[in-house]
A protein has these predicted regions:
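One-carbon transfer enzymes
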Residues: 1-102
Length: 103
């Protein structure tokens, strides 16, 4: 199983998850290019990417690009750990039953 962690900022939840489950936490996504979670991921050797909604003409296009990234990483499960965006219909359709919000 490959897990992606979504985070919008610091990434302390991601770091705990990655340290506890290093064999399955394989990818980090952030909706901010300057989020510290990306630096944490780099330090732990976890693949990562970021996209910002303002770079796209619509949320649908944003989520389509995100789905492409996740599919390329062969992600099975998504953990929302401090992710501050609302997940839209494109993501929900593709990952139905495979998204867990961690608070």
């Amino acid at each position: 199983m490959k897990i992606a962690v979504f985070a919008s900022g610091n990434g302390s939840n991601f770091q705990r998850l990655a340290e506890q489950f290093p064999k399955v936490v394989k990818f980090v996504f952030s909706d901010h290019h300057d989020a510290y979670v990306l630096e944490r991921a780099d330090k732990l050797g976890v693949a990562n990417a970021s996209l910002e909604l303002k770079e796209f003409t619509s949320k649908v296009d944003y989520e389509k690009a995100l789905v492409e990234i996740l599919e390329a990483q062969e992600i099975d499960l998504i953990l929302l750990a401090g992710y501050m965006k609302i997940i839209g219909s494109t993501m929900l359709a593709r990952y139905k039953g495979k998204i867990i919000n961690v608070h």
